[in-house]
């Protein structure tokens, strides 16, 4: 079953090579015996690092990418962060190391999991998860088995028909929400419009993973139980960063934030378990009545997942919520900011969308969305300019040479490619300009590619068997939302966007999302 995903990754790699035509360079081959020893990798001492994270320390309230940049200035393109309790972390900002890391990740690429999440699943709620780790936090053969099982469900294009209708319905509700809350004079959204975008994303994910309509964009917007879920998802992002990315003091000291995070994870787990339990009951009733759809003829993604077992369905739903809610908010917000400040790009996108949506209320279908190259280029450029995090992590299964140093097996290695692609001119010319054309298959765009870029720098959904399992769902969600918004409204924003987001480990909104949505004529 993994062959489908490998083929998809080959296609992605070919597209990236097209973007970086001829510019990729092989990492310099250095014999392990000739490499400088691991102990010589520069970096702060354990005591220096602890002090830096304490109140008054240099890194106490510093965004992660700025911390990495400070260490980059002090120690060079590769440096080591010693662990307070656990595994060291080696950070490299040398693009020539990235291929070495990905090509040596092994059969079951190991990514350091969130230890608080491991504790929650293996200790706090052991009776629910029963040894299941999931796609985002799991590793090893158990992860590989689950990934192989769900790949055909989540990644096959033909399964998009199972959730297309739900996503279109949610998008239409979002348009109506905009018309209700915008100022009738200025056409602006209220200061807290980011909350509505977050609700759009959560509603969309639940419509796919749980086959459930929450009503977040309408009648159930202020429902206490649903708001509890929304707040719990925010806690997971904020508290997970504080407790897991920073030194893990929670292992040794009673910390209120740790208890709060456990309560928030309980809320999300119970919510998913309840709705999946209802779905399983419906499936059992259909089976007794003889009306259960045959395998391959299911009418929802949840129905397919539920054929495995309750734990699998719960874990996939939770993973989609954890990995999709805030990141997709940032991505969609970033694309809207970019389009609002680039009226020429917005006009070109509108022209393309009019080709499939001649009227504002024309229907979106799988068929008419197949050929939208400029829309997809806008999404890629938005993801490049507004990445959700600095990069990714891998644990090396055997010794490798990175930047001339021997990195020993079992070491966690991080890369900062996302930050580099968003901010560094040597990798992307006109780096802070929104230029979707750089992603089109046009030989005249070669000047929009940095001379030192490599094919392994733009991988926002990951690489290989560990690439994001929810990529197709997120792509479709964005394509539907942006198509409907641009077709119905002229999008504007009358304020600076230089500091639109703030970065901790994941990025969060930093300014009021006071977009203008001006109704278009037919």
Curated annotation (Swiss-Prot):
Signal peptide: none annotated. One of its GO terms (molecular function) is heme binding. GO terms for cellular component: mitochondrial membrane. Heme binds at residue 468. It is found in: Mitochondrion membrane. SUPFAM superfamilies: Cytochrome P450. Its EC number is 1.14.-.-. Keywords: Heme, Iron, Membrane, Metal-binding, Mitochondrion, Monooxygenase, Oxidoreductase, Transit peptide. Its cofactor is heme. Belongs to the cytochrome P450 family. PANTHER family: CYTOCHROME P450. This is Probable cytochrome P450 12e1, mitochondrial. The gene is Cyp12e1.
């Amino acid at each position: 079953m993994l062959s489908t995903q490998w083929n998809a990754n080959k296609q992605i790699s070919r597209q990236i090579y097209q973007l970086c035509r001829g510019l990729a360079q092989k990492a310099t081959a250095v014999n392990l015996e000739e490499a400088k020893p691991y102990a010589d990798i520069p970096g702060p001492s354990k005591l220096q690092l602890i002090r830096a994270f304490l109140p008054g320390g240099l890194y106490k309230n510093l965004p992660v990418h700025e911390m990495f940049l400070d260490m980059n200035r002090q120690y060079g393109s590769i440096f080591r962060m010693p662990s307070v309790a656990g595994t060291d972390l080696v950070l490299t900002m040398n693009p020539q190391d990235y291929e070495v890391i990905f090509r040596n990740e092994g059969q079951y690429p190991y990514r350091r999991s969130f230890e608080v999440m491991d504790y929650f699943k293996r200790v706090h709620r052991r009776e629910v998860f029963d040894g299941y780790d999931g796609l985002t936090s799991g590793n090893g053969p158990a992860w590989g088995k689950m990934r192989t099982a769900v790949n055909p469900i989540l990644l096959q294009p033909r399964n998009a028909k199972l959730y297309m209708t739900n996503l279109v319905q949610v998008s239409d509700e979002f348009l109506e929400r905009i018309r209700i809350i915008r100022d009738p004079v200025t056409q602006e959204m209220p200061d807290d419009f980011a909350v509505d975008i977050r609700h759009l994303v959560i509603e969309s994910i639940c419509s796919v993973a749980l086959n459930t309509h929450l009503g977040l964009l309408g009648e159930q917007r202020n429902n206490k139980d649903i708001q509890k879920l929304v707040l719990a998802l925010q806690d997971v992002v904020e508290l997970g960063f504080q407790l897991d990315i920073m030194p893990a003091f929670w292992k040794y000291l009673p910390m209120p934030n740790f208890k709060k995070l456990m309560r928030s994870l309980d809320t999300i787990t119970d919510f998913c378990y309840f709705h999946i339990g209802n779905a399983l009951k419906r499936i059992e009733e259909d089976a007794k009545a003889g009306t259960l759809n045959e395998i391959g003829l299911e009418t929802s993604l949840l129905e397919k997942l539920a054929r495995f077992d309750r734990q699998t369905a719960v874990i996939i739903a939770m993973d989609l919520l954890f990995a999709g809610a805030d990141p997709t908010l940032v991505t969609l917000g970033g694309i809207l900011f970019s389009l609002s400040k680039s009226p020429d790009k917005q006009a070109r996108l509108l022209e393309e969308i009019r080709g499939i949506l001649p009227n504002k209320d024309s229907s979106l279908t799988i068929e008419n969305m197949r050929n939208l190259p400029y829309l997809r280029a806008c999404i890629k450029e938005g993801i490049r300019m507004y990445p959700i995090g600095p990069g990714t992590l891998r644990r090396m299964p055997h010794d490798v040479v990175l930047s001339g140093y021997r990195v020993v097996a079992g070491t966690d290695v991080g890369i900062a490619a996302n930050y580099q692609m968003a901010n560094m001119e040597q990798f992307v010319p006109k780096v802070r300009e929104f230029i979707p054309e750089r992603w089109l298959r046009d030989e005249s765009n070669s000047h929009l590619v940095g001379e030192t870029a490599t094919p392994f720098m733009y991988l926002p959904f990951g690489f290989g068997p560990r690439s994001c399992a929810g990529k197709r769902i997120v792509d479709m969600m964005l394509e539907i939302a942006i198509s409907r918004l641009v077709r119905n409204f002229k999008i504007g924003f009358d304020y600076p966007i230089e500091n639109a987001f703030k970065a901790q480990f994941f990025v969060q909104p930093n300014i009021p999302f006071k977009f203008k949505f001006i109704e278009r004529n037919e």
